[in-house]
Amino acid sequence: MPMNPALALQEAMLARLRDDAALTNMLGGQKVFGRPPRRTAPPYVVFGDPETRAWNTFTETGHEHRLTLHVYSEHGGRKQAYEIIARLDELLDDAPLPLTDHHLVNLRCVFWTALRAADGRLFHGILRLRATTHPLQ
């Protein structure tokens, strides 16, 4: 059974981010997570819940994905959050990521911001991406 395209995309993105020495240095270690960590000190990056829609036609099948990466920064504040977002953008925008059982047609960063979190001590950076995939034949 082929891998779910959203999971294949998240796996490839996670591998790309974890393999980058500059991002690892910015985060102070391997702090890119598929789900929110417990008791991990900021800064760190967490994948949000993906949204996937079919874009099938009479001749082709495929999916559109909307993904969100969350960046949490404390002492470095908004500046640190934006620096991490900029690195994520460099690594992911139009990246030729290899996917299991699927082909990545495109991957684009479409929105980013950094806001003071409700607790007043953290900054919450948000990076949204859009991707399209189709299954390998």
Which residues does each predicted region cover?
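Small/polar-rich, solvent-exposed N-terminal microdomains that initiate assembly or binding
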Residues: 1-57, 95-100
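Residues at secondary-structure transition points
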Residues: 4, 8, 56-60, 75, ...
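A generic structural signal for short beta-strands and their flanking turns/coil linkers
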Residues: 28, 41-43, 63-67, 103-105, ...
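Short beta-turn/strand-loop junction motif enriched in small, turn-promoting residues
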Residues: 52-55, 74, 114-115
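Oligomerization/assembly interface segments of phage tail-like spikes and tubes
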Residues: 61-75, 123-134
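Mid-chain, well-packed structural core segment of small domains
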Residues: 71-94
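Acidic-leaning, charged glycine-interspersed low-complexity segments
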Residues: 90-137
